[in-house]
Design a protein with these regions (language model features):
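Conserved ABC ATPase signature
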Residues: 125-132
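ABC-family nucleotide-binding domains
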Residues: 153, 159-160, 164
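ABC ATPase nucleotide-binding domain signature region
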Residues: 41-44, 52-99, 189-191
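Hydrophobic anchor residue at the start of the ABC signature
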Residues: 139
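Conserved ABC ATPase "signature" region
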Residues: 106-121
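Conserved catalytic loops of ABC-family nucleotide-binding domains
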Residues: 170-192
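A short, proline-enriched helix->beta-strand linker immediately N-terminal to the Walker B motif
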Residues: 144-148
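A short, flexible loop at the N-terminus of ABC-type nucleotide-binding domains that lies
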Residues: 1-37, 62
Length: 201
């Protein structure tokens, strides 16, 4: 990825003429966009590049051209769906992520684990979890990370209604945060949450 340029004081993350994707053809083309503090949504149909954009923003996918500028702190991005994580326990996942984020909130993690019914699963390997519970492992870490920028890919997929409501409540509060950004990629944006920006792909 190109060397980041100084970031505007208005934004905690921004792109300049960013192009890239997982294959030879870029799903994201010449994207110039800025994300301020608050809650943001990236919408699009299947195959439009939602996940690719999050990976580009996180530095998990190299850009073909353009640049990403991030405020001097940290970005949370984690994908625990791959088979390489199957043998890792829930607690081990959290333990591995914790040192990367200096503002990690262990008390919040405990509260979220309780709210999302994951406390009893801490010692289980990820391969033993349902798709929804596996997603909760990432979500709990993301929300407890304290990262300046948190990237969430389809956070409600395969979740039970109680957990969806708990995540929605958290994001409603996050929308008012003065210095942190949550960027969510999903098919549709919620109609009852105050968004700082909405980007359609």
């Amino acid at each position: 990825m190109s060397t980041p340029q100084p970031i505007s004081s208005t934004f905690v993350l921004q792109t300049s003429a960013l192009s890239g994707g997982p294959g030879a053809l870029p799903l994201i083309k010449d994207l110039t966009h800025g994300w301020s503090a608050g809650l943001h949504w990236i919408c699009g149909d299947e195959g439009t590049g939602k996940t690719s954009l999050l990976r580009l923003l996180a530095g998990d996918l190299s850009a073909m051209s353009g640049s990403v500028s991030v405020a001097p702190d940290d970005v949370f991005w984690a994908d625990l769906q791959g088979a390489e994580h199957d043998q890792t326990t829930v607690q081990a996942c959290w333990d591995a992520l914790r040192p990367r984020y200096p503002r990690w909130n262990e008390e919040l993690l405990q509260d979220l684990a309780e709210a999302l019914d994951m406390t009893q699963h801490r010692a289980k390997r990820l391969e033993m979890l349902s798709t929804g519970s596996r997603r909760k492992v990432m979500l709990i870490a993301a929300l407890a990370s304290g990262a300046t920028v948190t990237l969430l890919d389809q956070p409600f997929a395969a979740l039970d209604l109680k957990s969806i409501r708990a995540i929605q409540d958290f994001l409603n509060e996050a929308a008012e945060h003065p210095s942190r950004a949550w960027i969510v990629a999903d098919y549709e944006a919620p109609g009852d949450v105050p968004l700082a920006s909405l980007l359609h792909l």
